Amino acid sequence: MERLLQPSSSSSSISPSKFPSRTSPFLPRLRSSGLSFVSTHRPESRRVSSISCNSSQIPSLYTPIGSNTTNNSFNGSPKSDESKPNPGFLTRIATSASEQRKTLSTGTVILISAVAVLLLNPLLAPPAFASFQTAAKSGWLTSAWTGFLAGCLHTLSGPDHLAALAPLSIGRSKMESAAVGALWGCGHDAGQVIFGLLFLLLKDRLHIEVLQTWGTRIVGLTLVIIGAMGIKEASEIPEPCVALETDISMVSTEKEALPLPKKKKIGFATFATGVVHGLQPDALMIVLPALALPSRLAGSAFLIMFLVGTVIAMGSYTAFIGSCSEALKEKVPRITEKLTWVSSLVAIGLGLGIVISPFFGFSLY
């Protein structure tokens, strides 16, 4: 030991002679108690420090207790290292704990959502069901209004309808004329329904062209018959007697003696005329749209309201004619007879035109 330490001491003794005026802080300082040097950057000091560390680790015979303590400390260090947990194991524990927390939080959210749905279902279900009902109701209501308007237009746009109803409603009161038009409209609807059912049952076996040809001829003949009956009724109206004398009492008695004109009867003939006019291929305009609608409810609503619109339109038309003729009767003498003659001649002319026009290559119906 002393030999190994002598070079370092000699080197330390030489260094002050080289630099007498400066004291270097890098020179090692000797400790009298431990005989060891502070760490320096020179290689000799590294060797001395390694030797001193090795000498401290060598057990001495004179200090058995210290050696035991040192051995125990060195032996106990690996045990302490073994007792330290593995960092990978700690990370796994942390991740498993976080996953459990996430699972618990997810389960809590699901439970809260289920409870909220159960609580809000009685509040949200009726409005949703009501909106669905509103949509369905609006669908069949739209179909119903469409059918009603189609029935009204079909009635008022047909010249045969107007020509056939005018002679029957002139000379009547407003309510009687409305009843005539409604009865004629019911017959027209019955004819359309019959033709629609025949079309659905027979389909390909039903020759539409043949039916249209003969139906057009029958409609023309019915118009001629209605016109002829109107002329007959107009000719039966008695002419007012002309008083030659200016006796007021005589004129009054003659007016009282005048027979009242016969009122036209509302019966089966009016209904049958409507049925004949309804047995036409134009009845398909109520069958085909009803079949093309998306639901049976919408189709039924269209069909029913078409028939109702036809009856209402015809009743309104005849009521208007009857009220006008009744109002003019009080102001213009013999206006009822004149209107009956005009309407009857129009019906006869239209009927003849419908019958004869196909022979000239065109059709008026």
Curated annotation (Swiss-Prot):
Which residues does UniProt assign to the signal peptide?
none
Keywords linked to the UniProt accession: Chloroplast, Membrane, Plastid, Transit peptide, Transmembrane, Transmembrane helix
Q: Which tissues show it?
A: Mostly expressed in leaves and flowers, to a lower extent, in stems, roots, floral bud, inflorescence and siliques, and, barely, in seedlings.
Q: What ranges does the record list as Low complexity composition bias?
A: 7-24, 62-77
- Example of a GO biological process term: leaf development
Could you list the residue ranges that cross the membrane?
A: 109-129, 139-159, 182-202, 218-238, 274-294, 301-321, 345-365
**GO cellular-component term (any):** chloroplast membrane
Which InterPro entries is this protein grouped with?
Chloro_ReproSupport/MetalTrans, UreH-like_TM_dom
What compartments host this protein?
Plastid, Chloroplast membrane; Plastid membrane
User: What topology in the membrane does the UniProt record assign?
Assistant: Multi-pass membrane protein
A Pfam family in this protein? DsbD_2
- Give the knockout phenotype: Various vegetative defects, including reduced leaf size, dwarfism, and abnormal cell death. Plants lacking both CGF1 and CGF2 are impaired for female gametogenesis and embryogenesis, and have abnormal leaf morphology with yellow patches associated with an altered chloroplast integrity; this phenotype is rescued by sucrose treatment.
UniProt region (Disordered), positions on chain: 1-30, 62-90
Transit peptide start and end? 1-79
Q: Its biological function?
A: Together with CGF2, essential protein which supports female gametogenesis and embryogenesis, probably by securing local energy supply.
Q: What is this protein called?
A: Chloroplast protein FOR GROWTH AND FERTILITY 1
Organism name: Arabidopsis thaliana
According to the entry, what is the taxonomic lineage of the organism? Answer: Eukaryota, Viridiplantae, Streptophyta, Embryophyta, Tracheophyta
What gene name does this entry carry? CGF1
